[in-house]
């Protein structure tokens, strides 16, 4: 079967001429591709018309419902997600842009804007409003709250401060909530922020409960069968091997352990135990991925309107699918995305299926490195990043990026090289954990991520300019292939023509995500009518998300956008722009008037 590719060339002196070229169809039978060259406007327009549904259909609104028992049995009304749509009374002629993005663009120009996104875990060191503001000013795109630590009341306070920060200071910081997961981990250390385990010390790991403070050199464990499952001679790894113990004696619910590798014990650190050089996995495999506490935390996240829920220790795609159905049932118009944390052998065994089912993935290298040989972690990281790129899922590289900066004001050179490699692999985002949650230098750590990202991105663009990045087709994942073809073509045109920016007008973010996947040389200005979509796009590589009211009239949208951005000094007359849209499924090339 073949399908026509029509070229319409118009000028002011005569009627359009039409050229028809038959070729094997790359589009569904419901659509066609038109290339229009408007000489008088210096505008090249490529349009693909299709009967496929546009992603601009308005979702049906419904109240947010949460489970009171964490299992979905009893439902009650909860607070509507904040900022899902434009606030009532918002001026339709205005445009909302992150203040840091605007400043970066004005200061550095199109080519030198940062493309890699930055995530900060919020903890005692960064939970104040002024501290959050400094992180946002330093380039934080997403704030992460970890339900392993703190109470829901504390996390609600942080979320409220982040909302206030966005509303009052002009930021678009998204919120990501991590579930605790059902893996075996330590308790809270009796309220202490940390404890130092020295070489040769004897520590007691127990399932008994104690009122603070804990007895000296005692650690509680969350798994009741811990003392029964471990054996004398087993090796116990804390927090991915940051501290190591050898089991030397079992006395009822207590397990006596000898410290063989000293280090810092942190509250609720993950525990794994090895026997004869192999990870003991049987007990962990029997634990559910999402615990009863996790379900209550998820209900909390839905009620508070978080943008992302990151699921710990995902074992299969079915877990992700179940959670997405759960969220949809309780908030039908919810924009919450589900991120799969890849941090176990089970995750690696079902990697592609898990990523396909999710809305993104996190390479949690710390816990992953506790279950596979250390030398295997870099290759697995690269594999995960590549699969996410192929399947058009944002990917976060996390854990121990700048671990030394928890205590020191500058990173090791090896850490800088590690960050550089993550940027070079073109992951969407880098994440700080303990560095920002409890470290002494959270702002400096963020500055390091930002500066290294900028340098490596600039170097990569200079070395790889005009290089065509071939990606496998993902059209089978969507209802049609037109959007993918348009975005691939637009990105290649942008590189070849050395345009200043790509504009994309999108309701649900799909077209913007496809453009981000192509990793073009220029920045991508993503315009959406929905505040929650704007925040969600803040996770993806190269996207500068704006909230803007627009119509189906692309000429009107472009004129309006040009006027608003020129008034803010973000673009100027003569800048070369390529614009795509999911309304008309078109490509337009033009100079800013």
From Swiss-Prot:
InterPro entries attached to this UniProt entry: Pyr_Knase, Pyrv/PenolPyrv_kinase-like_dom, Pyrv_kinase-like_dom_sf, Pyrv_Knase-like_insert_dom_sf, Pyrv_Knase_AS, Pyrv_Knase_brl, Pyrv_Knase_C, Pyrv_Knase_C_sf
Tissues in which the UniProt entry reports expression: Highest levels in roots. Also found in stems, leaves and flowers.
Subcellular location: Plastid, Chloroplast
Protein's UniProt keywords contain Signal: no
EC number annotated for this UniProt entry: 2.7.1.40
Coiled coil: none
Protein name: Pyruvate kinase isozyme A, chloroplastic
